[in-house]
């Protein structure tokens, strides 16, 4: 059995001590979540101070970002974490998406499914598996020039997990 936990960080600088402590007491994974601080930044520090702990977001708000932004973040984090990164995405709730992030809210399960599909298409392009040609109902990613293509990740693309409530989002998570 593997044991993972989230690390509540009042100050993102605390990642340099909290995550090594989790590793030293036997946890297999340590995750951040989107609350007072961006969930990705503390993981950079955690990666510098750990060697085996799986690191990831549980969760980053997907609807506050676009698939290309998320793919670039995940690719960079996978490199910095030495192949230990997990991209965990969640939708948040409608009032926060619309009023806090000023982003559209529509068909959350379909949107989450398409975000994950688009991220995977972007990863495939970077891994040399063909041109970028993702054409969904909500997102389109159809151009990737060498200046923006990080190329194959030396650790492979990170896993993408989703979280959510209700049967539709559970179905998305099952197929993510």
Regions inferred by a protein language model and the residue ranges of each:
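Residue-level signal for the nucleotide or nucleotide-sugar donor/cofactor binding architecture
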Residues: 10, 64-68, 72, 107
């Amino acid at each position: 059995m593997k044991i993972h936990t989230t690390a509540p960080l009042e100050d993102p600088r605390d990642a340099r001590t909290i995550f090594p402590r989790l590793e030293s007491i036997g946890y297999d994974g340590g995750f951040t979540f989107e609350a007072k601080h961006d969930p990705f930044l503390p993981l950079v520090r955690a990666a510098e101070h750990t060697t085996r702990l799986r690191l990831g977001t549980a969760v980053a708000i997907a609807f506050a970002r676009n698939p290309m932004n998320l793919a670039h973040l995940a690719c960079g984090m996978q490199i910095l974490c030495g192949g230990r990164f997990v991209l965990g995405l969640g939708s948040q709730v409608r009032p926060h998406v619309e009023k806090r992030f000023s982003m559209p809210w529509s068909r959350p399960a379909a949107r989450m499914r398409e975000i994950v599909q688009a991220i995977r298409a972007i990863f495939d392009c970077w891994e040399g598996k063909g041109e970028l040609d993702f054409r969904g109902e909500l997102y389109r990613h159809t151009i990737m020039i060498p200046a923006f293509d990080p190329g194959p990740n030396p650790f492979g693309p990170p896993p993408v997990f989703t979280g959510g409530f209700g049967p539709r989002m559970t179905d998305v998570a099952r197929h993510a």
